[in-house]
Amino acid sequence: MSHNDTIVAQATPPGRGGVGILRISGLKARDVAQEVLGKLPKPRYADYLPFKDVDGSALDQGIALWFPGPNSFTGEDVLELQGHGGPVILDLLLKRILTLPGVRIARPGEFSERAFLNDKLDLAQAEAIADLIDASSEQAARSALNSLQGAFSARVNHLVEALTHLRIYVEAAIDFPDEEIDFLSDGKIEAQLNGVIADLDAVRTEARQGSLLREGMKVVIAGRPNAGKSSLLNALAGREAAIVTDIAGTTRDVLREHIHIDGMPLHIIDTAGLRDASDEVERIGIERAWQEIEQADRVLFMVDGTTTDAVDPADIWPDFIARLPKNLPITVVRNKADITGETLGISEVNGHSLVRLSARTGEGVDVLRNHLKQSMGFDTNMEGGFLARRRHLQALAEAAEHLEQGKAQLLGAWAGELLAEELRLAQQSLSEITGEFTSDDLLGRIFSSFCIGK
């Protein structure tokens, strides 16, 4: 599909509504206005008039907005038709527009993609549009808006600019080796490099917070049957999301709940009780439980406190611990403290966190909530933050690695050429965030996840 085509799509959600909006962008948008409206509206003024069919009869009436390029969202000529939000009406109007030559249905995210290609947005800002639409909390929405307004891009561009100046200095030292002053060893380059590394570390810290806001934390509740896993899911969710009985093996499939702890999304997964099962349905549920455990950010190892006094997970169930993926964080949750009389709270046992609570009464659950928030390093007091994606974290990590490699070359061998190459690679990694250096495949993956009308 060509970017020279004129595209059209519904910009409002499908289904019935008070208002339905069709968006048209491209060279033929002017022709669409002439054919459907009978005239070209005054730029950036709301015009109330009928929307006409091929034979001149009215299909609907509403507001038309005309944004001639380059002063539009996409940078192209853009026409918006705001009519009644009935699916039949919008479908008739869409079919009418598609009868015109050179007009086609937009691909998902194509309006935002054209805005990016026409330098109306950088890539991080374009992604922020989708993140703002998908925001699951007020804090996530505010951070996504900050990204859309350029907060994240400004931080990245500052780093790129600092690297550009540093590269100029290093290249000069390489090109003029006969100067009386040895620029590579006089300490100035090292000082500037340390400054860039410190600034990058600060951006990475904020980006990790932004990623938590966007992606959340996947927590799997696992343990033996009847340990209270479903009761804990209900306590964390604040509602009866799972069936709770005294019958072992009640939960046979994976149950998912999405909650927020002070703005941080938490994806809680309740799993079937782990045991050697002869029942085929239960056996499948247990296999699914292990699949979820292997993909978790943290596992809550649920223990029935009435069955054992052990607190070390290796003593409680060594086979379970042995099967866990290496380096997967676990929190031991000793349940039924209301029966055992154990002191509620959190402690450390052989490097593992141990929480004592009662899922049935809810006592101690707030301690667990706070522990989950702290274990992910989530800071609820960070103001003016931005949202970040996993690809952003990866790009920042790659840039940091190149800078550390460059510093090692500088201090170890005064190797200016190798330092210059590491600085170039770091700059390239950062530029991938804003799209100044990005492959077509990556662009395709990013924009294909957008809404059709975006």
UniProtKB/Swiss-Prot annotation:
Signal peptide: none
Record-level Gene Ontology MF annotations: GTP binding; GTPase activity; metal ion binding
Keyword Magnesium included in the entry's annotation: yes
Binding site for Mg(2+): S230, T251
Family matches, as InterPro entries: G_TrmE, GTP-bd, GTP-bd_TrmE_N, GTPase_MnmE, MnmE_dom2, MnmE_helical, P-loop_NTPase, Small_GTP-bd
GO process terms (BP): tRNA methylation; tRNA wobble uridine modification
GO cellular component: cytosol
Swiss-Prot/TrEMBL keywords: Cytoplasm, GTP-binding, Hydrolase, Magnesium, Metal-binding, Nucleotide-binding, Potassium, tRNA processing
Binding site for GTP: 226-231, 245-251, 270-273, 335-338, 358-360
Chief location bin: cytoplasm
Cofactor note: Binds 1 potassium ion per subunit.
Location in the cell: Cytoplasm
Binding site for (6S)-5-formyl-5,6,7,8-tetrahydrofolate: R23, E80, K120, K454
Domain TrmE-type G stretches: 216-377
Enzyme Commission number(s) from the entry: 3.6.-.-
Known cofactor(s): K(+)
Function: Exhibits a very high intrinsic GTPase hydrolysis rate. Involved in the addition of a carboxymethylaminomethyl (cmnm) group at the wobble position (U34) of certain tRNAs, forming tRNA-cmnm(5)s(2)U34.
Family: Belongs to the TRAFAC class TrmE-Era-EngA-EngB-Septin-like GTPase superfamily. TrmE GTPase family.
Assembly and binders: Homodimer. Heterotetramer of two MnmE and two MnmG subunits.
Name recorded for this polypeptide: tRNA modification GTPase MnmE
Source species: Salmonella paratyphi B (strain ATCC BAA-1250 / SPB7)
Gene behind this protein: mnmE
